[in-house]
Swiss-Prot record:
Compartments where found: Cytoplasm; Nucleus
UniProt keyword terms in alphabetical order: Activator, Cytoplasm, Developmental protein, Differentiation, DNA-binding, Isopeptide bond, Nucleus, Phosphoprotein, Repeat, Transcription, Transcription regulation, Ubl conjugation
Gene transcribed to yield this protein: NFATC4
Keyword match Ubl conjugation: yes
Ranges where the record places region Disordered: 16-180, 208-369, 791-870
Feature: compositional bias, Gly residues: 96-109, 151-165
SP repeat extents: 213-229, 277-293
Organism, as annotated: Homo sapiens (Human)
PANTHER family registered for this protein in UniProt: NFAT (PTHR12533), NUCLEAR FACTOR OF ACTIVATED T-CELLS, CYTOPLASMIC 4 (PTHR12533:SF11)
Pfam families from the UniProt entry: RHD_dimer, RHD_DNA_bind
SUPFAM superfamilies: E set domains (SSF81296), p53-like transcription factors (SSF49417)
Biological processes, Gene Ontology terms: brain-derived neurotrophic factor receptor signaling pathway; branching involved in blood vessel morphogenesis; calcineurin-NFAT signaling cascade; cellular respiration; cellular response to lithium ion; cellular response to UV; dendrite morphogenesis; heart development
Protein name: Nuclear factor of activated T-cells, cytoplasmic 4
Region (2 approximate SP repeats): 213-293
């Protein structure tokens, strides 16, 4: 290490780390016997104190004592102020040699070697003599946790009684050795070099004997010994101990009689291999320097830590931060001792220096330790919580000499007075900068400009104030980055003038009773201020590029007499003032209708925003692969269109012979790269006439005889012969039956839709009707329609079709001549005849047997169905069949504008 004796011999670290023999007990009043010269060369020997009165409590290594001119390292003394303590030496190191120690019985010298570390001593005046009489008492009256080490008068000067060169911390010493500790001739560079050399030798010695952790940082080191280690028997608890315990704590054997001076060393101190101890290690303090001597009081000694058996080892530190190490503004004023949680990111000491804040506070012996993070600082008081509205429920009545400021929240209605924005501005307006020309007045959403009206007062003209306000979630106030801009010109109809109120530009207009106290705001634009000019203001915290939304704020003061006014205020919807082009895109919010015939020609009305006079509406269709298949521009009616409404004519679809609805899309374009999102639209197929179908359409009846007329009266699709007809897919028949085809149905079974008008060859496309899908509904009975070609009378046999119907109401066909009575449950042929045209709005498409039918109908007949019953044909002839056919043809109603068939 360095020269520690007059013979410049090296200190032997083996004995320091527990390799020497047991030394005889030390005398109570002086030093113990020196080491035998033949056993070992002059070396360090630790003189340990007696176990503390709290029984096997760890002994903390205190700081070195303050220097006293002309004396050697006195015992620690309490400071005058309670709760603070002056430095204490760590322990005595007895050097073997021919010289005798001060007050010692032998020739050994005692060297106070605080952990073999170099540390700074804050020179302060000697403590008061009144406190020297009780060196073992704490300021709070509690006994000291450990006694001072033996031979407290170490640190001999060079050439002293024992002779030899050794450390001298006293400023009064005149040693010129570079190893003299803080001597007059020492400098900081020499101290740092000594620290580096001592630390390297300590690390080498510890690694040689394996007495410590190989980890570099003591705070990250594991336990320096295991619980089975006999040295751990002297610890106060079996809990895990951090490496700082091995640096800072000494253990003592079992309880022994307490004594102010120890009788003999009771254990060896162990060191961790590397790293820096916590603040209790007497390392060079950042606060202690050569240039600061005499400027600061001595730091207090570390307080012993009462360990919590359940607390983890890395949190066990010894040493209380001196009150001087905490800034005055953050010093804790309470009398409680708090322990700050260690920070893993704290750097280790460098050259014997510890970072500020590395010292830990401890509680008095026996007290529980409080680990509260951040207790080095006073709690910051919470900011004052302002109410959301400063006036709360106060009435908006003010004196004319003390009008409310612009950031004062005001209601829009008070009693009968109300300030209302009749027409709101649109949601986007491009504000202009100070270096460019005006971009015009703020526009309204439906076109034109905003309109403001005062309700409940029309006695005399009033002044309407307008300014640009904020649009965030906070209280309404003047906007810092935008101001109102006065617009003038031939097209401006509203007179206005500018004023400045509390640094905010205000536009003032007049509300006239002849205008119903309304004003058209066509004279107000928005001016954008430079962000840098505003952000550099004192107290401004907003950022300009993030505050681009504003509101138009209108305020009026209505006089009430007696020098009082009622102030009401109204704010518009938020307005986006940025120059982003996305805000200028047209938007379609609604449109009607949503479907049209493929022939087009219908009027389509679009509602949205940002529509221009030259806006276009384009219909497109894309294929499954996404390729454009059809594109057509619609014709826009400019006379009926404005900024929020577009009226146009739907164009024709490219294919007019579609049999199902076609999905297309349209969009509004304000120019290149300014298109609205696409909207869906449907083109529907149209109703068309067909040529008369062949006789195969009349299939489904047993007879193969031809009809006496060539007109197709079958309103149902062609169907196979009767045996397979009941098993048809009902979804194919539903569109037609839903329109009322198949009207000869008993009321017991439901049927939907009105009866059709007679039109030859009329057929609707299935896609224009709602289908029921392929789900099989409950089966119902269905009566086929009779035809004159049916030789069996067309009484209609019942068979299951499986279609849902609603129950119809009965109707009365024209009366027929009397005929033989009918036996059977089925109605006569006349039951399925349609009504004349004037009867459609009154009755349904059919009726059941004997329900609403005249007596002639009930008695007519003489024939029966040949399908389901065995009633024989009685007395029917071919002439009667022809007569019935003629009556049937004359009974069909004619549609409007057409003559019935002859």
């Amino acid at each position: 290490m360095g020269a520690a004796s007059c013979e410049d011999e090296e200190l032997e670290f083996k004995l320091v780390f527990g390799e020497e023999k047991e030394a005889p007990p030390l005398g109570a009043g002086g030093l113990g016997e020196e080491l035998d010269s033949e056993d070992a060369p002059p070396c360090c020997r630790l003189a340990l104190g007696e176990p503390p009165p709290y029984g096997a409590a760890p002994i903390g290594i205190p700081r070195p004592p303050p220097p006293r001119p002309g004396m050697h390292s006195p015992p620690p003394r309490p400071a005058p102020s309670p709760g603070t303590w002056e430095s204490q030496p760590a322990r005595s190191v007895r050097l073997g040699g021919p010289g005798g120690g001060a007050g010692g019985a032998g020739g050994g010298r005692v060297l106070e070697c605080p952990s073999i570390r170099i540390t700074s001593i804050s020179p302060t005046p000697e403590p008061p003599a009144a406190l020297e009489d009780n060196p073992d008492a704490w300021g709070d009256g509690s006994p000291r946790d450990y006694p001072p080490p033996e031979g407290f008068g170490g640190y001999r000067e060079a050439g002293g009684q024992g002779g030899g060169a050794f450390f001298s911390p006293s400023p009064g010493s005149s040693s010129l050795s570079s190893w003299s500790f803080f001597s007059d001739a020492s400098d900081e560079a020499a101290l740092y070099a000594a620290c580096d050399e001592v630390e390297s030798e300590l690390n080498e010695a510890a690694s040689r004997f394996g007495l410590g952790s190989p980890l570099p940082s003591p705070r990250a080191s594991p336990r320096p010994w295991t619980p089975e280690d006999p040295w751990s028997l002297y610890g106060p608890s079996p809990g895990g101990r951090g490496p700082e315990d091995s640096w800072l704590l000494l253990s003592a054997p079992g309880p022994t009689p307490a004594s102010p001076r120890p009788a003999s060393p009771c254990g060896k101190r162990r060191y961790s291999s590397s790293g820096t101890p916590s603040s209790a290690s007497p390392a060079l303090s950042r606060r202690g320097s050569l240039g600061e001597e005499g400027s600061e009081p001595p730091p207090p000694p570390p307080l012993p830590l009462a360990r919590d058996p359940g607390s983890p080892g890395p949190f066990d530190y010894v040493g209380a931060p001196p009150a001087e190490s905490i800034p005055q503004k953050t010093r804790r004023t309470s009398s409680e001792q708090a322990v700050a949680l260690p920070r893993s990111e704290e750097p280790a000491s460098c050259n014997g220096k510890l970072p500020l804040g590395a010292e830990e506070s401890v509680a008095p012996p026996g007290g529980s330790r409080k680990e509260v993070a951040g207790m080095d600082y006073l709690a910051v008081p919470s900011p004052l919580a302002w109410s959301k509205a400063r006036i709360g429920g106060h009435s908006p009545i003010f004196r004319t000499s003390a009008l409310p400021p612009l950031d004062w929240p005001l209601p829009s209605q008070y009693e009968q007075l109300e300030l209302r924005i009749e027409v709101q501005p649109r949601a986007h307006h491009r504000a202009h900068y100070e270096t460019e020309g005006s971009r015009g007045a703020v526009k309204a959403a439906p076109g034109g400009h905003p309109v403001v009206k005062l309700l409940g007062y029309s006695e005399k003209p009033l002044t309407l104030q307008m300014f640009i306000g904020t649009a965030d979630e906070r209280n309404l106030r003047p906007h810092a980055f935008y101001q109102v801009h006065r617009i003038t010109g031939k097209m401006v109809a509203t007179a206005s003038y500018e004023a400045v109120v509390s640094g905010t530009k205000v536009l003032e207009m007049t509300l006239l009773p002849e205008n119903n106290m309304a004003a058209n705001i066509d004279c107000a634009g928005i001016l954008k201020l430079r962000n840098s000019d505003i952000e550099l203001r004192k107290g401004e915290t907003d950022i300009g590029r993030k505050n681009t939304r504003v509101r138009l704020v209108f305020r009026v003061h209505v006089p009430q007499g007696g020098g009082k006014v009622v102030s009401v205020q109204a704010a518009s919807v938020p307005i986006e003032c940025s120059q982003r082009s996305a805000q200028e895109l047209p938007q379609v919010e609604a449109y009607s209708p949503s479907a049209c015939s493929v022939r087009g020609g219908e009027e389509l009305v679009l509602t949205g925003s940002n529509f221009l006079p030259d806006s276009k509406v384009v219909f497109i269709e894309r294929g499954p692969d996404g390729k454009l298949q059809w594109e057509e521009e619609a014709t826009v009616n400019r006379l009926q269109s404005n900024e929020v409404t577009l009226t146009l004519t739907v164009p024709e679809y490219s294919n007019k012979r579609v049999s199902r609805p076609v999905q297309v899309y349209f969009y509004v374009s304000n120019g290149r790269r300014k298109r609205s999102p696409t909207q869906s639209f449907r083109f529907l197929p149209v109703i068309c006439k067909e040529e008369p179908l062949p006789d195969s359409s009349l299939r489904g009846f047993p007879s193969a005889s031809a009809t006496p007329f060539g007109t197709d009266m079958d309103f149902s699709p062609p169907r196979p012969p009767y045996p397979s007809y009941p098993h048809e897919d009902p979804a194919c028949e539903t569109p037609y039956l839903s329109e009322g085809f198949g009207y000869g149905m008993p009321p017991l079974y439901p049927q939907t839709g009105p009866p059709p008008s007679y039109r030859p060859g009329l057929r609707m496309f299935p896609e224009t009707r709602g289908t029921t899908g392929c789900a099989q509904p409950p089966a119902v009975s269905f009566l086929p329609r009779p035809f004159p070609s049916d030789p069996y009378g067309g009484r209609g046999s019942s068979f299951s079709l499986g279609l849902p119907f609603s129950p119809p109401a009965p109707f009365r066909p024209p009366p027929l001549p009397a005929s033989p009575p009918l036996e059977g449950p089925f109605p006569s042929q006349s039951d399925v005849h349609p009504l004349p045209a004037e009867g459609y709005n009154k009755v349904g498409p059919g009726y059941g047997p004997g329900e609403g039918a005249p007596e002639q109908e009930k008695s007519r007949g003489g024939y029966s169905s040949g399908f389901r019953d065995s009633v024989p044909i009685q007395g029917i002839t071919l002439e009667e069949v022809s007569e019935i056919i003629g009556r049937d043809l004359s009974g069909f109603p004619a549609p409007p504008g057409e003559e019935p068939p002859a």
